Amino acid sequence: MQQTQQGPKVQTQTLQGGAGNLNSIFQRSGRTDGGDARASEALAVFNKLKEEAIAQQDLHDDFLVFRFDRDQNRVGYSALLVVKRAAINGQQVIVTRPLVMPNDQITLPTKKLTIQNGMHQETIEAEADVQDVFTTQYWNRICDSIRQQTGKHDAMVINAGPTVIPADFDLKDELVLKQLLIKSVNLCDDMLAKRSGEQPFSVAMLKGTDETLAARLNFTGKPMHDSLGYPIRSDILVSLNRVKKPGQQENEFYEAEDKLNQVSCFVNLEYTPQPQQAIYGAPQQTQQLPPLTPAIVITDVRQAEWLKANTMELYLFALSNAFRVTANQSWARSLLPQLGKVKDMRDIGAIGYLSRLAARVETKTETFTDQNFAELLYNMVRPSPVFMSDLNRFGDNAAIENVFIDALGGVNQQRAVAAIIAGVNNLIGGGFEKFFDHNTMPIIQPYGTDIQLGYYLDGEGEKQDRRDLDVLGALNASDGNIQEWMSWYGTQCNVAVHPELRARQSKNFDRQYLGNSVTYTTRAHRGIWNPKFIEALDKAIASVGLTVAMDNVAQVFGAQRFSGNLAIADYAVTGTAQVSSGLVSNGGYNPQFGVGQGSGFY
């Protein structure tokens, strides 16, 4: 008897969401509309690199790479998704690192914003960027796409930290992309290990009997580079190294790597007006203070190349080493004049424009001595620095730095603070509450303005970090035109002006001062560290018996009064807090990603 072939079973579905949902309802295998060609090209490259890495035993064959197409998922930009799966305590867990791919061939709709302009409201249009595209809806659609492609419809999807492959990146640079793939898989492993109950890193793991730890400061001023080769300003590089004691050998015929981690930073001289007299009573400050406050801006935190893990505990330990630039006021060495550079945005002599002299101090001659340098800084720069971090939602540490961004404020703040404190307690073995009360004090506060990240081309055609245009850079670029310089400075921190207007005006100054080669990749949230948290972290690590020697710290100012303090605890906390409050606005621009349950980081 001949069997009757049955046709496909027809299911009645209710059309919801309009015509845009038709492909979700009537799903088919193939497509002819092409989609995002750049994302398709990237997928082919990554699949090739995946096969090579597995064949060369650089990676295990236990991960996937999916394309998240903008047309299919109705989002602003396509992405590649590096995916790892595991069953943890009976729960299907999927971790992904989204590699978002902006495309110059795709024009995003502009953002329409209503702003207050005096007594009136007006609507302005602003260009959308990657941060605008990567919303909670975008993340939720990534989760739906992964569940569909893996067939794990009930799986928990965790975010290993998104990054951006900029539109101008050459997809033929396979060496860099292979390293990006390996790093992305390792970041997925970080999140799976955390969920699986892996023992967290602690400083107790470093207390070997045959070695010591030493911090080294490097002031070459050459930029570091991120995973894709884009420059990161690094006027000061603090590296932590393990040093074997004399006569000790760890391995026969093999020299182990000695570097543990490194932190990049630069000194931004924030203009700090004199405190005004209080409305009631005596003035808050009777002594005339220098007009500039040094802000140590941390731009990059990374583990040594040989160390593949990157966890909250490892990040905090590396971060703590940034504070060692306070030893003997070492941070000031990054401001020393560079002889031979004619057009120098970092010429410290430009701060003379803000002095009573109201003129540039000539620093490029042999007659400008170390004594002159010390006197210039003593008169113009306050001795105690503020510490800041540029936190990047799409950087190499995105999964960790998103937690610190959440700690700046918003609906996820409480969870973020708890995660940071838990990380510190893991690092030191518990008891951090003896050093810092996070219930009554913030860990970090918002600067109030997003920092545009990107690069420009210098005179030799080399890419340099856009953040070279800081307070000192703008003073030099404006040639002492204080009115123009103050207009630039307002685009950086005048919270009375809408952030989108500040960003637009800031980009105009970028083109004026840096040239038309300026290219933007994403934005960073600049946070100001609570000085009491800095002290507490430093003391807590020291309290568990970890001693770090300073390998190459020299006295910068000899016997001058501005010689500074030997440890961060010696700084006047109230003085630092005063600076912080002058820079922070409660109305600071801090857009929240991942409202409620949508972030995927926790």
Curated annotation (Swiss-Prot):
Compositionally biased tracts (Low complexity): 1-14
Subunit text: Homotetramer. The tetrameric protomers further assemble as a square grid.
Protein name per Swiss-Prot or TrEMBL: Chimallin
Domain of life the protein comes from: Viruses
Family: Belongs to the Phikzvirus chimallin family.
Annotated region (Disordered), positions in chain: 1-33
Keywords: Host cytoplasm
One cellular-component annotation, GO: host cell cytoplasm
UniProt function note: Self-assembles to form a proteinaceous shell that encloses the viral DNA and compartmentalizes proteins and DNA during viral infection. This micrometer-scale compartment contains narrow pores and is the site of viral replication, with the proteins involved in DNA replication localized inside. Provides a surface for docking of capsids during packaging. Probably protects the viral genome against host defenses.
Main location: host cell
Compartment(s) where it occurs, according to its Swiss-Prot or TrEMBL record: Host cytoplasm
Keyword tRNA-binding annotated: no
